[in-house]
Amino acid sequence: MRAMILAAGRGERMRPLTDTLPKPLLRVGGQPLIVWHIRRLVAAGIADIVINHAWLGERIEAALGDGAAFGARLRYSPEPRALETAGGIAQALPQLGDAPFLVVNGDVWCDWDPAQAYAQAGALDAARGQAWLLMVDNPEHHPQGDFHLLENGVLAATGGRRLTYAGIGVYHPSLFAGVQPGTPARLAPLLVEAIARGTARGSRHDGRWVDVGTPQRLAELDAMLAGGTIGATGPGESAGRNTSES
């Protein structure tokens, strides 16, 4: 199975920290945020990883190299201009293959085990599905949530619990068939269409999740990781935004 880490954002809310350093290389708990993702993926047996980048992307490649230092096989998908989430994934499809793949937003921190992606990918194939999303309880920053999750795991426009998309999902390449490579495109409209077709499912994660989208949350996560108060399981409180709108 292959994975993609989304790392092309400018990091406007992180300025001035991101004026000279790309957001994925900001350090938390003694290492760059993106390295936490790489290590967790490799530990789950997912070593083939594609990373997209735009702003200061050459620094990401210089810092991570080919991934051998982490036991990974890294490949890069540079974007001359940021293509947004769906546009970036569509451009990287030739490197991701024809099977369902895992996508992780580079600016979230979560204790979810990526090894669970194998089962979700198999379920997508078996049901001819297009998307599986990891969902979390709505944080105070995004109380309205994103999508409704029914008891049978189906994502729906109404009914069930309305939860927040965690920025982690398994996708079938067919979801992006209508996106022209090199064209900016948002992910949320594609997910809404998949939900309407009945090809999107999800699961609620009741563990730790944090959107590392502001300097304050970065500092809080760094302090907790460095202090050993959350280790591999995450911070005591989740904090987030509407990651499906990226």
Residue ranges and their predicted role:
Residues 46, 102, 109, 113-126, ...:
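Catalytic-core segments of class I nucleotidyltransferases/pyrophosphorylases
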